[in-house]
């Protein structure tokens, strides 16, 4: 049964060759192979069952069914029968007849494939060679060996063709989402065929499982012979009886299907109890066809079996399927071996192309090694075969693990991409609403600007009036209206240009948005039309199926009527024969009566004759009536035959029409697929347009923020003019009061400065203690190397001269700054309070540090604003161990008093030497300060107060300035303070980007690395953990299941908390505990459960990605 199904299943469907011809060709081939090899197999009628398989099942049959010529070997195969072996012959016959009628559509559909034609030509050449070999009928083993070698060469060619077909099927699977519509139509067309295919699969798999588990292996050839005889006896003579038997067998087939499913589940549970799993599949073609170069040899075997034994130089080294591994394990216990290398290849090929349609199909991977039942080989090779099988199991496990990882990574990336697409759609909607809101705000701002311009004109008239009053009273004032009017005109012109550009860009954006919305509506309409077309096609298909069912029912009714008429004709024939016999008897009686008449009384004889004549007339009338009834019955039978012929012609025409409709459906499907590809391209174009719109919206926001700044400047100017009108008479009193307050603040500032000097003295004393320790170390180093001491003395002398010059220059700069501060603490306090906080001891020390680093161009202070990004990330306080804190606190703490005390003590001769010693000691032990450069660079990033001090010096007036000039100063100072504010140097684009990064920290990472946010975060993790051992981050699930990835990622920031060299991948709980504790020590809350992470091999990738995002947000943003 197994061999017959595989041999015909491997033959592809070719146009122009009918099903019945294929079946007729298969029957003599199988019968001749059975007579030559001395083994009995079932007839080829069961082979037509495999013709209704789908494309994947056809490939599976091709991979496993090339062994059709193995019947020439003459080996006896024990085919264990299923539980329902009694009803199997009749059922097989019924299935063969049904497959002849139901497989025509699939054969016509697949006839266009070039690969199938090549496989068909190869199959025909193989069949012709097999016929020639069978016609010779040579009983010798040498001739059988030549036939087997020829079959093996044909098998290698067919296996190559299988490789080509497998690559094509893989390329089709890559566009599975585009072929979803085609799959639906195909499922509807093959709905009536899948049940029979599943029955055949379950039968074959049940035999394979029983062969593996050693159940019912002692079946004789008598069963096969009896099944064959039953098949021949039960073959129907006409189509009508076949249809009747099909209807009768339908319920039996369903019951057997349920029984086979139950047995299949039972065997599956039994295998799971033994510790094996059949759900792992081989999806890699390299594993399958890597052993095609094996050269099998034919060794003559026992002549009583009529064949030979197949051996190979690398017996058992090829990787087998899971079923082969199970069979090898069972056969090792039973001292038998049922497989070899080429059969393993067959079973693997059939497994690779086997589709998994349901949970019960997990066992549906036919293996030819168990079905063929190859005899056992020498015991000396069992050890090497066992070792090779262990190596094969290890390779299979590794490859399966790799394929599972790739599959999970791909699904994870697809889920992340879909989620980001949904986020982008939401962002697009938000941007559209924001754009509309900005348009409304722009209208409101334009109205407000018009109102402010009206107020400005009104205030300008009032100012002219007040100036005329000042001129009448001979009060002097500063005339700067020309400069102001020019600046106002320039600002107004710029604002009008910006407003015009904004309106033009908004119109463009609205046009693009309308175009995109129209395109989206058209795409939705096309999709709706495609769905409607698919629904219509489905309805049409259902209608055709209903018509076919009604025709079949009508045909069955006609067949039943014909049977009734035939039975009536037969009964009439029997009655007519009986009457003929009765007539002969009556004639004999008449003859006897004539003889009696001649010898006896005539009157009595005449009465008898009269009665006999009456009976004769009655019999003749009855015979004539029966003949007329017979003629009518024959006419009715002829009419019914004509009706049946017409119905068959109509059925053939309907089949041709159905084929045409299927071709039209395929063409429609191709059109839908092309339209779907066009929709995909349009979707990608829409995505690109969305990205462009996002950039334009960001630019629009930047322009809007800039416009807001200009408008705020104009509003501030208007407010200042209004305040100037009201405060002009009270300005002098206010200034006197402020002078008194600022003098008090200046005294407080001097007291704070004295406190800072005291603190600096304390720091200096600590630094001197550290310097003493460093001097002792330097003395020890000088004793070790005298040559270096001389060089150090030379360097020391040069450094002393340089440091003295720096200290003197610094003292001069400090004195100038202090003088400027004393002079500028007057009116400049008003402007400085609006833009800067009150100076404290910390800010003074930082300003002195930044001033002391000005002569060194590499350590120049970088002014930083609250919103500007930091030039270098510094680790938090928890990232430094206590030993590192102690070693870092020396150079950092001792560098401050060198500059903080320079204004009070300008004649320190030892300061350059000590500073030089500190630098020398810091360079002599770089291993103890692995992260000191980052801390020192962080020290240089301080807020510089030089710009504000220069501004104060510029706007400060002499102490004896006139009140009018002070009032003029008051009008200009707010403008200067606005331009010197910390947020003035940040552009609107930078502000919006910083807000976006704070809201979504992965957006900047996605812009940096490109692609999706998930891939960008994955690349960042790979870059951060580069160089760490046992770390391979490919996804956010299985790559993090041992905790080493978390430890490596946090070790880059917190090396004191994680001893990475002491960790291993086996102690998962310790790894996760260290990583989560280190993250919690700096404020990163743990969102993962340690027990769940330790227990599961593949944690939830979204939870892991969320936690890694929190780590990135804390340390990198």
Swiss-Prot record:
Region (Disordered): 1-176, 293-323, 358-390, 852-878, 920-997
Recorded GO MF terms: beta-catenin binding
SMART domains registered for this protein in UniProt: CH
Calponin-homology (CH) domain mapped to chain residues: 1011-1116
Coiled coil: 168-280, 394-449, 487-807
Polar residues compositional bias, start-end: 293-303
GO annotation, cellular component aspect: cytoplasm; filamentous actin; gap junction; microtubule organizing center; spindle
Cited InterPro entries: CH_dom (IPR001715), CH_dom_sf (IPR036872), F-actin_Monoox_Mical (IPR050540)
Compositional bias per record (Low complexity), positions renumbered to this chain: 45-72, 99-119, 358-377, 971-990
Location of Phosphoserine modifications: 384-385, 389, 868, 881, 887
Pfam families reported in the protein's UniProt record: CH (PF00307)
Bias (Basic and acidic residues) ranges: 120-131, 158-171, 946-956
Protein location: Cytoplasm, Cytoskeleton; Cytoplasm, Cytoskeleton, Spindle; Cell junction, Gap junction
One GO BP: negative regulation of actin filament depolymerization
Keyword Cytoplasm attached: yes
Keyword set, alphabetical order: Cell cycle, Cell division, Cell junction, Coiled coil, Cytoplasm, Cytoskeleton, Gap junction, Phosphoprotein
Assembly: May interact with both microtubules and actin cytoskeleton.
PANTHER family: CALPONIN HOMOLOGY DOMAIN-CONTAINING PROTEIN DDB_G0272472-RELATED, CYTOSPIN-A
Family the entry assigns: Belongs to the cytospin-A family.
Biological role: Involved in cytokinesis and spindle organization. May play a role in actin cytoskeleton organization and microtubule stabilization and hence required for proper cell adhesion and migration.
Name under which the protein is recorded: Cytospin-A
Naturally occurring in which organism (per UniProt): Canis lupus familiaris (Dog)
């Amino acid at each position: 049964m197994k061999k017959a199904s595989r041999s015909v299943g491997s033959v592809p469907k070719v146009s122009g060759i009918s099903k019945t011809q294929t079946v007729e060709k298969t029957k003599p081939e199988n019968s001749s192979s059975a007579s030559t090899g001395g083994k009995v197999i079932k007839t080829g009628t069961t082979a037509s069952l495999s013709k209704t398989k789908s494309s994947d099942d056809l490939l599976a049959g091709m991979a496993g069914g090339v062994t059709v010529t193995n019947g020439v070997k003459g080996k006896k195969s024990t085919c264990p029968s299923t539980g329902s072996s009694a009803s199997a012959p009749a059922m097989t016959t019924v299935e063969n007849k049904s497959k002849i009628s139901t497989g025509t559509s699939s054969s016509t559909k697949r006839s266009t494939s070039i690969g199938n034609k090549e496989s068909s030509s190869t199959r025909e050449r193989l069949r012709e060679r097999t016929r020639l070999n069978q016609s010779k009928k040579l009983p010798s083993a040498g001739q059988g060996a030549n036939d087997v070698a020829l079959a093996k060469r044909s098998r290698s060619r067919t296996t190559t063709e299988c490789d080509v077909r497998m690559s094509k099927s893989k390329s089709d699977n890559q566009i599975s989402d585009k072929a979803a519509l085609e799959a639906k139509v195909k499922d509807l067309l093959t709905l009536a065929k899948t049940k029979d295919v599943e029955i055949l699969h379950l039968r074959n798999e049940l035999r394979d499982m029983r062969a593996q588990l050693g159940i019912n292996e002692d079946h004789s050839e008598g069963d096969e012979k009896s099944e064959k005889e039953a098949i021949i006896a039960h073959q129907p003579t006409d189509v009508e009886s076949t249809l009747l038997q099909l209807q009768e067998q339908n319920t039996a087939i369903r019951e057997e299907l349920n029984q086979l499913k139950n047995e299949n589940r039972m065997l599956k549970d039994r295998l799971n109890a033994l510790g094996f799993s059949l759900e792992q599949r081989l999806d890699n073609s390299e594993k399958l066809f890597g052993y095609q170069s094996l050269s099998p040899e034919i060794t003559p075997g026992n002549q009583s079996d009529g064949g030979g034994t197949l051996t190979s130089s690398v017996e058992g080294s090829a990787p087998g399927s899971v079923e082969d591994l199970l069979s090898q394990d069972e056969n090792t216990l039973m001292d038998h071996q049922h497989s070899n290398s080429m059969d393993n290849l067959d079973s693997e090929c059939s497994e690779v192309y086997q589709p998994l349609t349901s949970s019960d199909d997990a066992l549906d991977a036919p293996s030819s090694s168990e079905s063929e039942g190859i005899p056992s080989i020498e015991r000396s090779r069992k050890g090497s075969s066992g070792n090779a099988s262990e190596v094969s199991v290890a390779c299979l496990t590794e490859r399966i693990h790799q394929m599972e990882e790739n599959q999970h990574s791909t699904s994870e990336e697809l889920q992340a991409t879909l989620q980001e697409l949904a986020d982008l759609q939401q962002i697009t909607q938000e941007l559209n609403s924001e754009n509309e809101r900005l348009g409304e705000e722009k209208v409101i701002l334009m109205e407000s600007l018009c109102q402010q311009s009206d107020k400005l004109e009104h205030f300008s008239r009032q100012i002219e009036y007040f100036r005329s009053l000042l001129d009448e009273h001979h009060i002097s004032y500063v005339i700067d209206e020309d400069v102001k009017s020019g600046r106002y005109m320039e600002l107004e012109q710029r604002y009008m240009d910006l407003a015009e550009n904004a309106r033009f860009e908004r119109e463009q954006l609205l046009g693009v948005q309308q175009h995109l919305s129209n395109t989206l509506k058209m795409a939705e309409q096309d999709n709706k039309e495609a769905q409607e077309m698919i629904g219509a096609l489905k309805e049409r298909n259902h209608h055709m199926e209903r018509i076919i069912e009604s025709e079949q029912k009508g045909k069955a009714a006609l067949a039943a009527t014909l049977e009734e008429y035939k039975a009536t004709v037969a009964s009439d024939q029997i009655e007519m024969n009986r009457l003929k016999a009765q007539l002969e008897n009556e004639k004999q009686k008449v003859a006897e009566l004539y003889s009696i008449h001649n010898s006896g009384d005539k009157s009595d004889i005449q009465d008898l004759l009269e009665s006999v004549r009456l009976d004769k007339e009655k019999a003749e009338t009855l015979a004539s009536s029966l003949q007329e009834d017979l003629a009518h019955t024959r006419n009715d039978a002829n009419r019914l035959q004509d009706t049946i012929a017409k119905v068959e012609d109509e059925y053939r025409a309907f089949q041709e029409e159905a084929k045409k409709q299927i071709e039209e459906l395929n063409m429609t499907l191709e059109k839908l697929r092309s339209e779907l590809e066009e929709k995909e391209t349009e979707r990608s174009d829409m995505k690109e347009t969305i990205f462009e719109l996002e950039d334009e919206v960001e630019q629009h926001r930047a322009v809007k923020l800039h416009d807001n700044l200009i408008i705020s400047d104009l509003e501030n100017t208007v407010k200042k003019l209004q305040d100037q009108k009201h405060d002009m008479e009270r300005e002098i009193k206010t200034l006197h009061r402020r002078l008194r307050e600022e003098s008090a603040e200046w005294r407080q500032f001097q007291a704070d400065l004295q406190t800072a000097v005291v603190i600096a003295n304390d720091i200096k004393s600590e630094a001197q203690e550290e310097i003493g320790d460093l001097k002792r170390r330097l003395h020890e180093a000088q004793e070790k190397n005298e040559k270096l001491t001389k060089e150090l003395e030379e360097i020391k002398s040069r450094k002393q001269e340089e440091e003295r010059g720096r200290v003197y220059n610094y003292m001069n700069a400090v004195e100038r700054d202090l003088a400027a501060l004393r002079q500028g603490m007057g009116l400049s306090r008003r402007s400085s309070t609006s833009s800067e906080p009150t100076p404290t001891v910390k800010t003074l020390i930082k300003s002195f540090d930044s001033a002391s680093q000005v002569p060194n161009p590499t350590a120049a202070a970088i002014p930083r604003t609250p919103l500007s990004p930091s030039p270098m990330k510094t680790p938090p306080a928890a990232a430094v161990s206590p030993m590192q804190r102690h070693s870092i606190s020396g150079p950092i703490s001792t560098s401050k008093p060198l500059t903080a005390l320079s204004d009070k003590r300008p004649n320190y001769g030892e300061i350059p030497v000590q500073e030089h010693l500190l630098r020398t000691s810091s360079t002599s032990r770089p291993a103890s300060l692995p992260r000191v450069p980052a801390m020192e660079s962080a020290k240089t990033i301080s807020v510089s107060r030089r710009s504000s001090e220069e501004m104060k010096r510029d706007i400060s007036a002499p102490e004896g300035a006139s009140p009018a000039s002070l009032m003029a100063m008051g009008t200009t100072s707010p403008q200067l303070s606005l331009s010197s504010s910390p947020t003035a140097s940040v552009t609107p684009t930078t502000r919006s980007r910083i807000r976006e990064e704070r809201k979504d920290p992965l957006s900047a990472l996605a812009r940096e690395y490109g692609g999706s946010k998930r891939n960008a975060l994955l690349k960042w993790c790979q870059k951060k953990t580069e160089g760490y051992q046992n770390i391979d981050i490919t996804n956010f699930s299985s790559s993090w299941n041992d905790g080493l990835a978390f430890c490596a990622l946090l070790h880059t920031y917190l090396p004191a908390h994680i001893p990475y060299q002491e960790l291993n991948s086996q102690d998962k709980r310790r790894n996760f505990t260290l990583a989560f504790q280190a993250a919690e020590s700096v404020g990163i809350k743990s969102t993962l459960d340690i027990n769940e992470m330790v227990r599961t091999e593949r944690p939830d990738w979204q939870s892991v990605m969320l936690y890694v995002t929190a780590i990135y947000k804390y340390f990198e943003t």
